[in-house]
C-alpha cells in the first residue's frame, strides 16, 4: 500500500469554497443581528445585488483558492482574501446595475459596504477558509482503517 498523497487540490478547494460561503453567510447574519443593520442598506438594489456579489465572490474564491492550495503556502490565504473582497465589491456594483438600479446608487452601496463591519467579516471568513483549504491540501492524512484493512507489510 502506497503512502497517502493527501487530499487532491480540487477537492480541498471545493470544501474550502463551501466553507467560505457558509461562514460568510453566517457572519453576515450574525453581524446584522449584532449591529441592527442590513448588509446592503440601499433598498433600491434589491436582493439581486447581494446574491450576485456572493456568487461572484465564491467563484473568485474557488479559482484563487485552488491556485493557493496547489502551491501549498499559507501566505496564499491573504491573496485569496484580497481577491475575494474585490470580487464581492465588484459583484455588488454589477448586481445592482443588472437589477436595474441607478449605477450611482450601486457604486454608493459599494462604498457603504467597504467601510462597514461586513467587509471585515468577509475578509476574515475568506482568509480562514482559504487557510483551512491550504491546510487540507497539505495534509498527508488518510482515512481511518480497521486493523484487518491494513496491508500485511505494515504490521
Residue ranges and their predicted role:
Residues 22-24, 62, 84, 114:
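A general marker of short, structured functional hotspots
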Residues 24-54, 91-121:
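Membrane interfacial helix motifs at helix-loop boundaries and amphipathic/re-entrant anchors
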Residues 14-19, 75-92:
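Transmembrane alpha-helical segments of multi-pass membrane proteins
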Residues 5-14, 43-48, 69-77, 111-120:
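Hydrophobic, aromatic-rich alpha-helical transmembrane segments
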Residues 16-19, 43-44, 51-63:
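N-terminal low-complexity, intrinsically disordered segments
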Residues 1-11, 59-81, 97-101, 126-154:
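Cytoplasmic membrane-interface segments at the C-terminal ends of transmembrane helices
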Residues 21-22, 85-86, 124-128:
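Core hydrophobic alpha-helical transmembrane segments of single-pass membrane proteins
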Residues 12-25, 129-130:
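Alpha-helical transmembrane segments
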Amino acid at each position: 500500500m502506497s503512502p497517502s498523497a493527501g487530499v487532491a487540490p480540487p477537492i480541498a478547494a471545493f470544501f474550502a469554497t463551501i466553507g467560505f460561503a457558509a461562514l460568510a453567510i453566517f457572519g453576515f447574519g450574525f453581524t446584522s443581528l449584532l449591529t441592527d443593520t442590513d448588509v446592503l442598506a440601499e433598498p433600491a438594489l434589491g436582493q439581486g445585488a447581494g446574491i450576485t456579489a456572493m456568487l461572484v465572490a465564491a467563484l473568485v474564491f474557488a479559482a484563487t483558492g485552488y491556485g493557493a492550495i496547489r502551491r501549498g503556502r499559507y501566505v496564499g490565504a491573504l491573496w485569496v482574501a484580497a481577491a475575494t473582497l474585490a470580487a464581492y465589491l465588484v459583484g455588488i456594483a454589477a448586481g445592482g446595475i443588472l437589477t436595474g438600479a441607478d449605477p450611482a446608487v450601486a457604486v454608493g452601496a459599494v462604498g457603504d459596504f467597504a467601510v462597514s463591519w461586513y467587509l471585515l467579516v468577509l475578509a476574515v471568513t475568506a482568509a480562514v477558509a482559504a487557510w483551512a483549504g491550504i491546510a487540507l491540501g497539505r495534509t498527508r492524512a488518510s482515512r481511518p482503517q480497521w486493523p484487518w484493512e491494513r496491508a500485511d507489510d505494515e504490521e
